[in-house]
Protein backbone atom coordinates (compact mmCIF):
# COMPACT_ATOMS: atom_id res chain seq x y z
CA UNK A 1 0.00 0.00 0.00
CA UNK A 2 1.33 3.46 -0.88
CA UNK A 3 2.33 5.66 2.06
CA UNK A 4 2.42 9.43 2.46
CA UNK A 5 3.31 11.75 5.32
CA UNK A 6 0.70 14.40 6.11
CA UNK A 7 0.75 17.34 8.50
CA UNK A 8 -2.84 18.59 8.70
CA UNK A 9 -5.99 16.80 9.92
CA UNK A 10 -9.53 18.05 9.32
CA UNK A 11 -12.16 16.05 11.25
CA UNK A 12 -12.08 12.56 9.71
CA UNK A 13 -9.79 13.46 6.80
CA UNK A 14 -6.24 14.57 6.13
CA UNK A 15 -5.35 17.52 3.94
CA UNK A 16 -3.17 16.41 1.03
CA UNK A 17 -0.44 18.55 -0.50
CA UNK A 18 -0.41 19.37 -4.20
CA UNK A 19 2.58 17.07 -4.60
CA UNK A 20 0.81 14.15 -2.94
CA UNK A 21 -2.36 14.69 -4.97
CA UNK A 22 -0.33 14.74 -8.15
CA UNK A 23 1.41 11.52 -7.11
CA UNK A 24 -1.95 9.86 -6.41
CA UNK A 25 -3.15 10.86 -9.86
CA UNK A 26 0.00 9.51 -11.50
CA UNK A 27 -0.34 6.11 -9.82
CA UNK A 28 -4.12 6.13 -10.50
CA UNK A 29 -5.06 5.42 -6.92
CA UNK A 30 -8.81 5.90 -7.63
CA UNK A 31 -10.72 4.03 -4.90
CA UNK A 32 -7.79 1.94 -3.69
CA UNK A 33 -6.76 2.49 -0.05
CA UNK A 34 -3.43 4.07 0.90
CA UNK A 35 -1.62 4.92 4.13
CA UNK A 36 -1.26 8.38 5.65
CA UNK A 37 1.33 8.91 8.39
CA UNK A 38 0.28 11.60 10.85
CA UNK A 39 2.00 12.36 14.18
CA UNK A 40 3.97 9.11 13.84
CA UNK A 41 0.75 7.06 13.48
CA UNK A 42 -0.55 5.12 10.47
CA UNK A 43 -4.04 5.55 9.02
CA UNK A 44 -5.63 3.64 6.18
CA UNK A 45 -7.37 6.14 3.91
CA UNK A 46 -9.17 6.54 0.61
CA UNK A 47 -9.24 9.54 -1.69
CA UNK A 48 -12.38 11.64 -1.24
CA UNK A 49 -12.77 15.11 -2.77
CA UNK A 50 -8.99 15.60 -2.93
CA UNK A 51 -8.62 14.69 0.74
CA UNK A 52 -7.60 11.48 2.48
CA UNK A 53 -10.68 10.12 4.26
CA UNK A 54 -9.74 7.97 7.26
CA UNK A 55 -10.98 4.39 7.20
CA UNK A 56 -9.11 3.09 10.24
CA UNK A 57 -6.06 3.60 12.41
CA UNK A 58 -3.27 1.03 12.13
CA UNK A 59 -1.31 0.28 15.31
CA UNK A 60 2.26 -0.28 14.12
CA UNK A 61 5.63 1.06 15.23
CA UNK A 62 8.63 0.63 12.95
CA UNK A 63 11.02 2.85 14.90
CA UNK A 64 14.00 1.94 17.08
CA UNK A 65 13.63 2.14 20.86
CA UNK A 66 16.52 4.60 21.02
CA UNK A 67 17.66 7.69 19.16
CA UNK A 68 20.08 6.72 16.39
CA UNK A 69 22.12 9.65 15.09
CA UNK A 70 24.43 9.60 12.08
CA UNK A 71 27.03 12.38 12.04
CA UNK A 72 28.48 12.11 8.55
CA UNK A 73 31.11 14.31 6.94
CA UNK A 74 30.03 16.25 3.88
CA UNK A 75 31.02 14.38 0.71
CA UNK A 76 30.11 14.67 -2.98
CA UNK A 77 26.44 15.50 -3.19
CA UNK A 78 25.29 12.42 -5.10
CA UNK A 79 27.00 10.13 -2.60
CA UNK A 80 25.68 12.13 0.35
CA UNK A 81 22.16 11.85 -1.03
CA UNK A 82 22.55 8.09 -1.42
CA UNK A 83 23.68 7.86 2.21
CA UNK A 84 20.66 9.91 3.33
CA UNK A 85 18.32 7.49 1.59
CA UNK A 86 19.93 4.31 2.91
CA UNK A 87 20.40 5.65 6.44
CA UNK A 88 16.70 6.49 6.55
CA UNK A 89 15.82 2.96 5.43
CA UNK A 90 18.00 1.62 8.26
CA UNK A 91 16.17 3.64 10.89
CA UNK A 92 18.28 6.69 11.81
CA UNK A 93 16.35 9.37 13.66
CA UNK A 94 18.72 12.27 13.00
CA UNK A 95 21.43 13.05 10.45
CA UNK A 96 24.13 15.64 11.18
CA UNK A 97 26.21 16.92 8.23
CA UNK A 98 29.73 17.14 9.60
CA UNK A 99 32.52 19.58 8.78
CA UNK A 100 35.92 17.97 9.38
CA UNK A 101 39.57 18.72 8.70
CA UNK A 102 39.57 16.68 5.48
CA UNK A 103 36.14 17.78 4.25
CA UNK A 104 36.25 19.05 0.68
CA UNK A 105 35.63 22.69 1.51
CA UNK A 106 34.75 23.51 -2.11
CA UNK A 107 31.45 21.74 -1.37
CA UNK A 108 30.71 24.29 1.35
CA UNK A 109 31.47 27.39 -0.74
CA UNK A 110 28.81 29.56 -2.39
CA UNK A 111 26.00 27.64 -0.62
CA UNK A 112 26.61 24.55 -2.77
CA UNK A 113 25.66 22.37 0.17
CA UNK A 114 23.19 24.47 2.18
CA UNK A 115 21.17 25.28 -0.96
CA UNK A 116 20.37 21.57 -1.30
CA UNK A 117 18.63 21.23 2.08
CA UNK A 118 15.09 21.16 0.69
CA UNK A 119 16.15 18.48 -1.78
CA UNK A 120 17.79 16.52 1.05
CA UNK A 121 14.59 16.70 3.10
CA UNK A 122 12.56 15.43 0.14
CA UNK A 123 14.93 12.48 -0.16
CA UNK A 124 14.47 11.74 3.54
CA UNK A 125 10.69 11.90 3.27
CA UNK A 126 10.55 9.67 0.19
CA UNK A 127 12.84 7.12 1.83
CA UNK A 128 10.78 7.19 5.04
CA UNK A 129 7.59 6.58 3.07
CA UNK A 130 9.17 3.75 1.09
CA UNK A 131 10.52 2.00 4.19
CA UNK A 132 7.29 2.36 6.22
CA UNK A 133 8.81 4.66 8.85
CA UNK A 134 6.64 6.32 11.49
CA UNK A 135 8.64 9.52 11.21
CA UNK A 136 11.04 11.35 8.93
CA UNK A 137 14.62 11.70 10.20
CA UNK A 138 15.67 15.17 11.31
CA UNK A 139 18.37 16.82 9.20
CA UNK A 140 20.35 19.35 11.24
CA UNK A 141 22.47 22.26 10.14
CA UNK A 142 26.16 21.69 9.47
CA UNK A 143 28.16 20.99 12.64
CA UNK A 144 31.82 20.70 13.55
CA UNK A 145 33.29 17.67 15.27
CA UNK A 146 33.60 19.61 18.53
CA UNK A 147 29.90 20.48 18.42
CA UNK A 148 28.93 16.84 17.95
CA UNK A 149 31.24 15.74 20.77
CA UNK A 150 29.45 18.21 23.04
CA UNK A 151 26.01 16.70 22.38
CA UNK A 152 24.39 15.14 25.43
CA UNK A 153 24.20 11.60 24.03
CA UNK A 154 26.99 9.70 25.78
CA UNK A 155 27.17 6.62 23.56
CA UNK A 156 29.30 7.64 20.56
CA UNK A 157 31.30 5.59 18.02
CA UNK A 158 33.78 6.94 15.49
CA UNK A 159 35.08 4.92 12.53
CA UNK A 160 38.84 4.91 11.97
CA UNK A 161 40.75 2.83 9.45
CA UNK A 162 44.05 2.92 11.35
CA UNK A 163 42.84 1.22 14.51
CA UNK A 164 43.32 -2.49 15.22
CA UNK A 165 40.72 -4.62 13.45
CA UNK A 166 39.81 -6.29 16.74
CA UNK A 167 38.20 -3.02 17.88
CA UNK A 168 34.81 -3.97 16.50
CA UNK A 169 31.41 -2.46 17.05
CA UNK A 170 29.84 -3.92 20.20
CA UNK A 171 26.43 -5.57 20.27
CA UNK A 172 23.75 -4.72 21.12
CA UNK A 173 23.06 -1.00 21.47
CA UNK A 174 20.87 -0.32 24.50
CA UNK A 175 20.78 3.48 24.64
CA UNK A 176 20.78 6.56 22.40
CA UNK A 177 23.79 6.48 20.09
CA UNK A 178 25.76 8.66 17.66
CA UNK A 179 27.81 7.17 14.81
CA UNK A 180 30.53 9.41 13.38
CA UNK A 181 31.83 8.87 9.85
CA UNK A 182 34.54 10.94 8.20
CA UNK A 183 35.01 12.08 4.60
CA UNK A 184 37.16 10.50 1.91
CA UNK A 185 40.51 10.21 3.66
CA UNK A 186 38.86 9.67 7.03
CA UNK A 187 39.37 11.64 10.21
CA UNK A 188 42.75 13.18 10.99
CA UNK A 189 44.82 11.77 13.86
CA UNK A 190 44.13 15.01 15.72
CA UNK A 191 40.37 14.50 15.38
CA UNK A 192 40.58 10.87 16.48
CA UNK A 193 42.61 11.86 19.53
CA UNK A 194 40.09 14.59 20.36
CA UNK A 195 37.23 12.09 20.08
CA UNK A 196 39.03 9.54 22.27
CA UNK A 197 39.66 12.20 24.93
CA UNK A 198 35.91 12.83 24.95
CA UNK A 199 35.17 9.15 25.64
CA UNK A 200 34.13 8.36 22.08
CA UNK A 201 34.71 4.70 21.21
CA UNK A 202 37.08 4.39 18.23
CA UNK A 203 36.16 1.35 16.13
CA UNK A 204 37.39 -0.50 13.06
CA UNK A 205 35.12 -1.36 10.14
CA UNK A 206 37.39 -4.16 8.93
CA UNK A 207 40.55 -4.59 6.93
CA UNK A 208 39.29 -2.93 3.74
CA UNK A 209 39.10 0.81 3.12
CA UNK A 210 35.49 1.83 2.57
CA UNK A 211 34.02 4.86 0.86
CA UNK A 212 32.52 7.32 3.31
CA UNK A 213 28.93 6.52 2.35
CA UNK A 214 29.64 2.77 2.51
CA UNK A 215 31.20 3.16 5.96
CA UNK A 216 28.11 4.98 7.22
CA UNK A 217 25.74 2.28 6.02
CA UNK A 218 28.06 -0.49 7.24
CA UNK A 219 28.06 0.97 10.76
CA UNK A 220 24.29 1.27 10.84
CA UNK A 221 23.65 -2.18 9.40
CA UNK A 222 26.03 -3.91 11.83
CA UNK A 223 24.35 -2.59 14.95
CA UNK A 224 21.62 -4.50 16.73
CA UNK A 225 19.54 -1.64 18.07
CA UNK A 226 15.99 -2.98 18.35
Task: Explain the meaning of each model-derived region.
Residues 25, 88-91, 196:
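Non-catalytic positions within long, well-ordered alpha-helices that form the structural scaffold/packing
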Residues 61-157:
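RNA substrate-binding interface of SAM-dependent RNA methyltransferases
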Residues 1-60:
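N-terminal positively charged helical leader segments and presequences
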Residues 157-186, 190-191, 201-203:
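Active-site/ligand-binding-proximal alpha/beta "capping" segment
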Residues 18, 97-101, 188-189:
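Short glycine/proline-centered loop/turn elements that form peptide/ligand docking sites
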Residues 189-226:
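Structured adenosyl-cofactor binding patch, chiefly the S-adenosyl-L-methionine
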Residues 15, 65-69, 175-178, 197-205:
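Glycine/charged-rich beta-loop-alpha catalytic/anionic-binding loops adjacent to active sites
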Amino acid sequence: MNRFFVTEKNNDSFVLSKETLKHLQVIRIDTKPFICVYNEKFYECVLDNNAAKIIKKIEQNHEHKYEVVLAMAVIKLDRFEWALQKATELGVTKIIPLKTQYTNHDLLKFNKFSSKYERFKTILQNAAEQSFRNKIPVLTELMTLKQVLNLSIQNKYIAHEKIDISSNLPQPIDSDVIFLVGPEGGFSDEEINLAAKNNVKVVSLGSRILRAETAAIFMLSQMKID
